Curated annotation (Swiss-Prot):
UniProt-recorded name of the protein: Nucleoid-associated protein Pfl01_0983
Residues making up the signal peptide according to the UniProt record: none
InterPro entries, sorted: Nucleoid_associated_NdpA
Family: Belongs to the YejK family.
Keywords assigned by UniProt, alphabetized: Cytoplasm
A GO CC term assigned to this protein in UniProt: bacterial nucleoid
Localization in the cell: Cytoplasm, Nucleoid
Main localisation: cytoplasm
Length: 334
């Protein structure tokens, strides 16, 4: 993963309304193994983060100037340090307007994966820990907590530059339960949601369930294809990449690689050729689980409609083919 440019600035601010103080770095960070490891860990943590949203830039304006600065940098009008400085000054201003915001180290990293350029921006905080010295003494130790990302975004610069119709070249971490504490960061990037990741994933899973039903597949085959879909989606999510419907279709049925893709198009589910995988929705699709009043139920989703029947009006489940271990326990209950 070649790192083209990387820099860190510090915004010192507490959530008490006091002015934010910017400590800007004057030059890029030199290439080092530490920088490479930090960015690799950051990407791994970011890709694993649930609840991300995907979108695109607002039209450039005084309220949303970031895309204009990025364009100027990519076209050679600004060097990376100058670009990051004007951007972090804008972030400082937005932080001061948001009483809930706290400061931190602001990372800007321009890197490549394959032939694709990315820009990652993250607000990082320290954690207190301990370390053991060469003299075997235990000493306090501070480190960047890359595992707890709350404000971060990643821009697929190549997609932004080359595909004017794309609505998902930016991904960003959304605040939990609509918390406004993260809104200033989204405004800083100047992005708007363009793709409903959970909604698109639910539609894809509905299309897949319809496909399996229309094909009248045996249970083993349905289970295998379900695993293929979930494994592919999870793999793409781990890489931070969207799911390609044509590629997924080829994996689901190698003998008829276009079958699932044609099903999606013919039934007009309204899915984009590439959609972001929402991990929370995928996990719900893999299994149904529930617990209440001493009862715990968990079963694989593909069993619904075959071994397990759900009566919504009566609020009941009918389970066929109980596990032998369970029936043996029931027989011995007296």
């Amino acid at each position: 993963m070649p790192i083209r440019h990387c820099i860190v600035h510090l915004i010192d601010k507490k959530p008490d309304g006091t002015p934010a103080v910017l400590h800007a770095r004057d030059s890029e960070l030199a290439e080092s193994a530490a920088i490479e490891n930090m960015l690799a860990d950051l990407n791994e943590s970011y890709n694993a983060k649930q609840g991300k949203a995907w979108g695109l830039f607002h039209p450039e304006s005084g309220a949303f100037p970031f895309s204009g600065w990025l364009k100027e940098y990519m076209e050679g009008g600004k060097d990376f340090t100058a670009f990051s400085k004007v951007a972090v000054e804008h972030l400082q201003k937005l932080m001061e307007e948001s009483n809930l915001s706290v400061g931190g180290h602001v990372l800007f990293a321009h890197y490549q994966q394959g032939m694709t350029d990315y820009l990652a921006i993250a607000l990082l905080h320290h954690s207190e820990g301990v370390a053991v010295t060469d003299q075997l003494d235990v000493t306090p130790s501070r480190h960047l907590d890359l595992g707890q990302l709350h404000l971060a975004a990643r821009i697929n610069v190549s997609e932004w530059q080359n595909n004017k119709q794309s609505k998902q070249y930016i991904s960003f971490i959304k605040g939990k339960n609509g918390k406004k504490v993260s809104e200033y960061f989204r405004d800083f990037i100047g992005c708007q949601e363009g793709v409903d990741g959970p909604g698109e994933t639910r539609t894809l899973l509905k299309a897949f369930s319809d496909f399996v039903e229309s094909e009248d597949l045996p249970e083993d085959s349905a289970r295998e294809k379900t695993k293929t879909l979930v494994d592919y989606a999870s793999s793409q999510a781990k890489l931070g990449e969207p799911m390609g419907l044509e590629e997924l279709s080829e994996l689901i049925d190698e003998e008829r690689p276009k079958a699932f893709y044609d099903h999606i198009r013919n039934k007009d589910y309204g899915l984009s050729p590439e959609i972001p995988a929402d991990k929370r929705t995928l996990n719900q699709f893999r299994r149904f689980t529930g617990r209440a009043e001493g009862l715990s139920i968990s079963f694989e989703a593909h069993l619904l409609g075959s071994k397990i029947e759900y009566d919504e009006e009566a609020g009941t489940l009918v389970i066929k083919g109980l596990p032998t271990s369970l029936t043996d326990q029931l027989k011995r209950r007296n």
